[in-house]
From Swiss-Prot:
Residues annotated as domain HTH arsR-type: 10-104
General remark: KmtR has tighter affinities for nickel and cobalt than NmtR.
DNA-binding region: 44-67
Name of the gene encoding the protein in the UniProt record: kmtR
BP GO annotations: response to cobalt ion; response to nickel cation
Role: Represses expression of Rv2025c and its own expression. Acts by binding to the promoter regions.
Chain intervals for the UniProt region annotation (Disordered): 110-130
Spans traversing the lipid bilayer: none
Annotated protein name in UniProt: HTH-type transcriptional regulator KmtR
Record organism: Mycobacterium tuberculosis (strain ATCC 25618 / H37Rv)
UniProt KW keywords: DNA-binding, Repressor, Transcription, Transcription regulation
Induction and repression of expression: Negatively autoregulated.
Length: 130
């Protein structure tokens, strides 16, 4: 009936993995941890200070994120450093935060960042000209 009916359905096992990723994102502390790791690796103590939670609590969240393959570790002596698993996780976190900013009032913060409004204005001007 339709030439292009959209993407094929996802296999059940892949859907389960996607659901697990979203389940991990459904916790405010884990979102703060992932956001903190978007641009650099950090130790548990650094993350605990950054998100304002006790280190044992952050450590438990990190264990869940690691099991879900959203973060990975690197040991340096007795210190374990955490970072996002890959660029896809980083992009997922950034996109989720930016999408949430669009739900609020006014201009989203990421559009106000250095060059943000200018970039939006240039894109708009290009559309008007073209």
């Amino acid at each position: 009936m339709y030439a292009d009916s959209g993407p094929d359905p996802l296999p059940d096992d892949q859907v389960c993995l996607v659901v697990e990723v979203f389940r991990m994102l459904a916790d405010a502390t884990r979102v703060q941890v992932l956001w903190s790791l978007a641009d650099r690796e950090m130790s548990v103590n650094e993350l605990a200070e950054q998100v304002g939670k006790p280190a044992p609590s952050v450590s438990q969240h990190l264990a869940k994120l690691r099991m879900a393959r959203l973060v990975r570790t690197r040991r340096d002596g007795t210190t374990i450093f955490y970072r996002l698993e890959n660029e896809h996780v980083r992009q997922l976190v950034i996109d989720a935060v930016f999408n949430a900013e669009h739900a609020g009032p006014g201009i989203p913060r990421h559009h106000r960042a250095a060059g943000g409004l200018q970039s939006v204005a240039k894109a708009s001007a290009t559309k008007d000209v073209g």
